[in-house]
From Swiss-Prot:
Gene Ontology molecular function: any one: phospholipid binding
Cellular-component GO terms for this entry: membrane
Highest taxon, organism lineage: Bacteria
Taxonomic lineage of the native organism: Bacteria, Pseudomonadati, Pseudomonadota, Betaproteobacteria, Rhodocyclales
UniProt EC number: 2.4.1.182
Native species: Aromatoleum aromaticum (strain DSM 19018 / LMG 30748 / EbN1)
UniProt-recorded name of the protein: Lipid-A-disaccharide synthase
Keyword Cytoplasm part of the UniProt annotation: no
Family: Belongs to the LpxB family.
Length: 391
């Protein structure tokens, strides 16, 4: 009888991660069958998508509330299917708000439930890890400091590295990136990344444009590239340029190409998030800037216990790059922070060494290590019940 694995990936990044995992498991278990909720990359690996992962996509709290009944119905229908089919294992890929509820009920049915990509429990106070302990048979972590948190709570855990570290070259090619983007080789380039969400671009675009204006006044040879993920975010940034009367600034907007823009750049101004990790893997000096609603920020400050929001600082356990948040994210402060990188080659070289060490630590063949951690859970007998020892 073929090994059967149920999976849920809730967004495009999870679809990619899960597709690599399916391929890695199949290298060890060629007859394995996969089904559940997934996207086109998973389907290209032979995944049977009962629902497309796009059905799980929500945009903010209001959208989540509006679609609660629909999403709850999908989750309960999948739970019934899994409990009836009794696959060898269930793997939830990211999407913790959807998956942890599902995993808890699947695990209590005697089916191993593995969660791939630890929620950011390290960023928040409180007892969320207690709920995770009740839900999962095994946690797969992307960052090296995470396993200790789960081990302390008695949760079986494996460190598998970060998939971006496997993909990104250890030595990025700035010249090739500039050639690809038709950027000059004899000037300094600043990449401006105001975020992928419309709310982020609305919040940061005007500030980033004024920052660019200040830098252009100081450096006649400077240029700016702004990769934007969608037509909507591009339109918002264009509106901000028009409102700022900034037609004279050497700012070039790109559709996508965020990695290429950062590779081509001398320094990066980036909203906190995965893009800051990408900038670190590309060994680029950066300034992290973020602005959210005042009540959200107060809540975040009350709940958070880490002194940083940016992944480069969190992973290095040190303030290696500036973070300017909320009211501190003024054009003057951002321009001054970027200027310090532009004027200090030694500091940039030292930072590149820190980021190189981080890159090597995260480069672990994520899909292969994740598959190796999952394999012991496959082909369990029907009588198997989860326990600290067997998990």
């Amino acid at each position: 009888m073929a090994t059967r694995i149920a999976m849920v990936a809730g967004e495009a990044s999870g679809d990619l991660l899960a597709s690599h995992l399916i391929r890695a498991i199949r290298q060890q278990v060629p007859e394995a069958e996969f089904y559940g909720i997934g996207g086109p990359k998973m389907q290209a690996e032979g995944f049977d998508a009962l629902w497309p992962c796009e059905r799980l996509a929500v945009h903010g709290y209001v959208d989540a509330l509006k679609r609660y009944r629909e999403l709850s119905g999908i989750r309960k229908a999948l739970l019934r299917r899994v409990q009836a089919d009794r696959p060898d294992a269930f793997i939830g890929v990211d999407a913790p708000d959807f998956n942890l509820w599902l995993e808890g009920r699947i695990r209590s049915s005697g089916i191993p439930a593995i969660h791939f990509v630890s929620p950011s429990i390290w960023a928040w106070r409180g007892g969320r890890i207690k709920g995770i302990a009740r839900s999962v048979s095994h946690m797969l972590c992307l960052f090296p400091f995470e396993p200790a948190l789960y081990e302390k709570a008695g949760i079986p855990v494996s460190y598998v590295g970060h998939p971006l570290a496997d993909v990104f070259p250890l030595v990025p090619d700035r010249a090739a990136a500039r050639e690809l983007l038709s950027l000059p080789t004899d000037c300094r380039i600043v990449a401006l990344l105001p975020g992928s969400r419309q709310s982020e671009v609305r919040s940061l675009a005007a500030t980033y444009i004024e920052t660019a204006r200040l830098l252009a006044e100081r450096h006649p040879d400077i240029g700016f590239v702004v990769p934007l993920a969608t037509r909507e975010t591009r339109a918002l940034f264009e509106q901000a340029l028009h409102a700022a009367d900034a037609d004279e600034l050497p700012i070039r907007l790109l559709f996508g190409h965020a990695v290429e823009a950062m590779t081509a750049a001398d320094v990066v101004l980036v909203a906190s998030g995965t893009a800051s990790l990408e900038a670190a893997l590309l060994k680029r000096p950066m300034v992290i800037s973020y602005r959210i609603g005042k009540w959200q920020y107060r809540l975040m400050k009350r709940m958070a216990y880490l002194p940083w929001v940016g992944l480069p600082n969190i992973l290095c356990n040190d303030s290696v790059v500036p973070e300017l948040l909320q009211d501190d994210a003024t054009p003057q402060a951002l321009a001054d922070a970027l200027d310090r990188w532009l004027n200090d080659a030694d500091a940039c070289a030292e930072l590149a060494l820190r980021f190189d060490a981080l890159h090597r630590e995260l480069r672990q063949d994520t899909a292969g290590r994740a598959a190796a951690a999952i394999l012991p859970y496959l082909n369990r007998s029907p009588e198997w019940k989860p326990s600290r020892q067997s998990a």
